[in-house]
Amino acid sequence: MTALKVGSESWWQSKHGPEWQRLNDEMFEVTFWWRDPQGSEEYSTIKRVWVYITGVTDHHQNSQPQSMQRIAGTNVWQWTTQLNANWRGSYCFIPTERDDIFSVPSPDRLELREGWRKLLPQAIADPLNLQSWKGGRGHAVSALEMPQAPLQPGWDCPQAPEIPAKEIIWKSERLKKSRRVWIFTTGDATAEERPLAVLLDGEFWAQSMPVWPVLTSLTHRQQLPPAVYVLIDAIDTTHRAHELPCNADFWLAVQQELLPLVKAIAPFSDRADRTVVAGQSFGGLSALYAGLHWPERFGCVLSQSGSYWWPHRGGQQEGVLLEKLKAGEVSAEGLRIVLEAGIREPMIMRANQALYAQLHPIKESIFWRQVDGGHDALCWRGGLMQGLIDLWQPLFHDRS
């Protein structure tokens, strides 16, 4: 069989995203490809194609940024790395005509953040990879899952929901803001007994990575009880950074304004042990804040990559929630908590480990998970579903 000429049309048609080969039981060598639309270096103005892999080459690693290399005389850019057999994560490419970003040999963490901040608005998904979405920072990303990546409940066999989610506009008097909220119901349980889940960053889980088919599938398979789901739009990054980190006004508005509005549309149980509040990053911090301050309403907390360093980004000081727990100003007694963090997000992992150590006396009601991933929705989506399953498991015993 004749070998295909590198960079030819038939060669590109043989590529379907990253390619890998096993090195040993634990590691794979993975190669990424990008096709330069301008052609070879003779015609193209592209100087760099940066590879941004969440938890591998991103700013959380404090490592040297990685650029693809062009195969001389072709339209082919490539980059090779090694990944664990159970790794899962998102990635994007950043082609640029600039060669002056990351010009310092060993940039520090702040220089890395600033460099990526300049580049990420130009990021693109991998054109060879069919599985892509708009990431939390607003740019497109693609998915990569190695052969032994852990199963993500429900995402393997989604089912179309019987009734679509209902989108409403919540005009908050307390917050002086209007935003979208999605209400979704599953199953046919008695309305007043249905558990409630409040999902922060609702626009992402409603639109970028819709959870409706997955929740439907898990309910049909009796891994989740029939329930009411409320997804709250963060509006934008500015509002998100103000409202989610330990903001009493936000949670008072949710309880006094939003939940009565939702209940008129889709009745649910008032019991705290049937109520989950779930979030990621600032949302994870916010979820635990809600549980600690209003345990009579929010008895179950699902926190993924929670920003427990807040408000001290450098990670040199303890975050405010940990300080309050240590001082006895708040207590997690009586809460059921899922605490999840990725080993590839070092500062967040350290903050979560410190929090877990403080919560250890009530470890019977805490699900602590370390995942081989970074600050990444592709990892969070599996943990979100597993967390709901774990937190609501006692409800199946209640019904038996």
Swiss-Prot record:
Highest taxon above the source species: Bacteria
Molecular function, one GO term: enterochelin esterase activity
Gene Ontology BP, a term: enterobactin catabolic process
One annotated Gene Ontology cellular component of this protein: cytoplasm
Subcellular location: Cytoplasm
Outcome of gene disruption: Mutant is unable to produce linear DHBS compounds.
Reaction(s) the record says it catalyses: Fe(III)-enterobactin + 3 H2O + H(+) = Fe(III)-[N-(2,3-dihydroxybenzoyl)-L-serine] + 2 N-(2,3-dihydroxybenzoyl)-L-serine; Fe(III)-enterobactin + H2O = Fe(III)-[N-(2,3-dihydroxybenzoyl)-L-serine]3 + H(+); Fe(III)-[N-(2,3-dihydroxybenzoyl)-L-serine]3 + H2O + H(+) = Fe(III)-[N-(2,3-dihydroxybenzoyl)-L-serine]2 + N-(2,3-dihydroxybenzoyl)-L-serine; Fe(III)-[N-(2,3-dihydroxybenzoyl)-L-serine]2 + H2O + H(+) = Fe(III)-[N-(2,3-dihydroxybenzoyl)-L-serine] + N-(2,3-dihydroxybenzoyl)-L-serine
Keyword Hydrolase: yes
UniProt keywords, alphabetically: Cytoplasm, Hydrolase
SUPFAM superfamilies membership: alpha/beta-Hydrolases (SSF53474), E set domains (SSF81296)
Activity regulation statement: Inhibited by N-ethylmaleimide.
UniProt key word Hydrolase: yes
InterPro entries, A to Z: AB_hydrolase_fold, Enterochelin_esterase_N, Esterase-like, Ig-like_fold, Ig_E-set, Mycobacterial_A85_antigen
Upregulation: Expression is increased under iron stress. Repressed by Fur under iron-rich conditions.
Cross-referenced Pfam families: Enterochelin_N, Esterase
Documented EC number(s): 3.1.1.108
SUBUNIT field: Monomer.
Record family assignment: Belongs to the Fes family.
Function: Catalyzes the hydrolysis of ferric enterobactin (Fe-Ent). Is responsible for the release of iron from ferric enterobactin. Also catalyzes the hydrolysis of iron-free enterobactin (Ent). Cleavage of ferric enterobactin results in a mixture of three hydrolysis products, 2,3-dihydroxybenzoylserine (DHBS), the linear dimer (DHBS)2 and the linear trimer (DHBS)3, while cleavage of iron-free enterobactin yields only the monomer. Hydrolysis of ferric enterobactin is less efficient than hydrolysis of unliganded enterobactin.
Protein name: Iron(III) enterobactin esterase
Record gene name: fes
